[in-house]
Swiss-Prot record:
This is Ribosomal protein L11 methyltransferase. S-adenosyl-L-methionine binds at residues 131, 152, 173, 214. GO terms for biological process: methylation. InterPro entries: Ribosomal_L11_MeTrfase_PrmA, Ribosomal_PrmA_MeTrfase, SAM-dependent_MTases_sf. Methylates ribosomal protein L11. One of its GO terms (molecular function) is protein-lysine N-methyltransferase activity.
Length: 278
């Protein structure tokens, strides 16, 4: 074991955190830990280049959304303790109704549907408030008769849950590394997808009983027409990754659909809509 390790810490606005995490999880990093005060990245290798990549990504986001986005980071060299084991101790298994999400080093629950996700190797583990409420919706609306699409699949956790519930599942993400992560996690959980591709919802030639999109509000608005188009008449559209302050904005964009339910957790919310038959 080396005598020192490097710890990179960063903070950003909550509505953009998932975009930064997508970048971080796509890199070869030993351990990533998300806490209330921000995100910690630890490695025995110097990670200065990761800090530079995050700073550059921040600048590009500000330009893309034409707004000021808060970002702060620090990089420290620290005395090495067995930080990988300490990191593992800090990761808690999570039970959401009948779904139990755990890591490869934690035990499954015999009476639950078990989902294996290692947070350091994925784009999402279920602990985020928006993912949590999304999973609650999926358990309510998904069954073996459904044809489903996961838009912005990240780690594949939502796709895997739908597959475990018996649905026929397709998934997409604009990040090629997310597709790789989803496929690896599907294999780990012994499920398969009907199709998965690099790109967005508009590449699909199908319509679905359930479309789920757990992505930030700005992207949901950009994809509004495609999300509605790919939802079958009588189908369910689940939107998540929405900060409470954007609730009215999102509801206004999707007001032509029937709002079935709103779930709140912390500063985030998820919405379940039905596309009525004309």
């Amino acid at each position: 074991m080396q005598t020192h390790y490097y710890e990179l810490f960063f903070q950003t606005d909550k509505e953009y955190l998932d975009l930064f995490l997508d970048l971080v999880f796509s890199l070869d990093i030993d351990a990533i830990e998300e806490k209330n005060d921000g995100v910690y990245i630890r490695s025995e290798e110097d990670i200065k280049l990761i800090q530079i990549a995050l700073q550059s990504f921040h600048q590009r986001l500000c330009e893309k959304f034409n707004t000021k986005i808060y970002f702060h980071s620090t990089l420290e060299k620290k005395e090495n303790k067995n930080w990988i084991e300490e990191y593992k101790k800090g990761i808690q298994a999570l039970t959401i109704d009948n779904i139990h999400i755990h890591t490869t080093w934690q035990k499954p629950k015999q009476d639950k549907i078990n989902i294996i996700i290692d947070p350091a190797l994925a784009f999402g583990s279920g602990h985020h408030e928006s993912t949590y409420t999304c999973i609650e919706f999926l358990q309510k609306y998904t069954d073996g008769s459904k044809f489903c699409l996961d838009v912005g699949c990240g780690s594949g956790i939502l796709s895997i849950i739908m597959a475990k519930l018996g649905a026929k599942v397709q998934a997409c993400d604009t990040d090629e590394l997310a597709i790789v992560a989803s496929k690896e996690n599907a294999k780990l959980n012994r499920v398969s997808f009907n199709d998965i591709w690099v790109g967005s919802v508009n590449k699909s030639l199908h319509k679905y009983d359930i479309v789920v999109a757990n992505i930030i509000a700005d992207i949901l608005i950009i994809l509004e027409k495609d999300l509605k188009e790919k939802t079958k008449e009588g189908g369910i559209l689940i939107l998540s990754g929405i900060l409470n302050k954007y609730e009215d904005r999102i509801k206004d964009k999707f007001k032509d659909l029937t709002l079935l339910e709103t779930k709140y957790k912390g500063e985030w919310l998820s919405l379940a809509y039905k596309k009525e038959t004309k």
